[in-house]
């Protein structure tokens, strides 16, 4: 277009392309830049791995967590869900992660459910590792964030699904 002297058309095309890329890069918007960055990065990772995700997110611009704590909370729980979902996907050809992240009654609710290949033993709200492979270490960091803000965390698992709910 530019070679043929169609600068305005080239500029318009470039602008539309840039807008399209920006929309793709920010598929999830919670009105909180750090939450958006983590969620969009994990969302792209799930898409690349062909893991389905069902999201329910709200406006989080008012949450008062330190940025580092947001990253610890979201990254650890989402990484665990993605890692286990990859295993399930290899075995069954299908994996769906359910994610809820909203403010309700002035509290942040973060709930995640993901499929599992086998039941994970949970004792005193921590994962009991059978293999000694540091399984569940990230959840200790999550628990530290939960404790720092005086919140609650509940973990549960059956033969098909792992659930984590954090309320801050």
Regions found by a protein language model. Give the residues of each.
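Conserved short strand/loop->alpha-helix "switch" segment adjacent to the catalytic nucleotide/phosphoryl-transfer site
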Residues: 27, 53-74, 130
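Short beta-to-alpha transition helix within the HATPase_c
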Residues: 15-19, 31-48
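Short beta-strand/loop element within the Bergerat-fold HATPase_c
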Residues: 90-106
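Conserved ATP-binding N-box helix of the HATPase_c
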Residues: 67-91
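Short alpha-helical Gxxx[C/S/T] motif in the catalytic ATP-binding
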Residues: 138-142
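Glycine-rich/acidic phosphate-handling loop/turn and adjacent ATP-lid/helix
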Residues: 106-136
């Amino acid at each position: 277009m530019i070679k043929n002297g169609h600068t305005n058309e080239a500029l318009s095309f470039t602008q539309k392309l840039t807008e399209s890329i920006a929309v793709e890069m920010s598929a999830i918007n919670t009105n909180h830049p750090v939450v958006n960055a983590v969620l969009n990065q994990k969302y792209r990772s799930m898409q690349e791995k062909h893991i389905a995700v069902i999201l329910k997110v709200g406006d989080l611009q008012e949450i008062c967590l330190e940025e580092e704590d947001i990253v610890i909370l979201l990254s650890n729980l989402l990484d665990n869900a993605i890692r286990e979902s990859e295993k399930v996907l290899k075995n069954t050809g299908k994996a769906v992660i359910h994610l809820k992240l909203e403010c309700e009654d002035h509290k942040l609710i973060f709930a995640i459910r993901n499929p599992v290949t086998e039941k994970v033993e949970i004792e005193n709200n921590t994962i009991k590792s059978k293999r000694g492979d540091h399984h569940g270490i990230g959840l200790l960091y999550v628990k530290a964030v939960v404790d720092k803000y005086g919140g609650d965390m509940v973990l549960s698992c059956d033969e098909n699904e792992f659930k984590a709910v954090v309320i801050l």
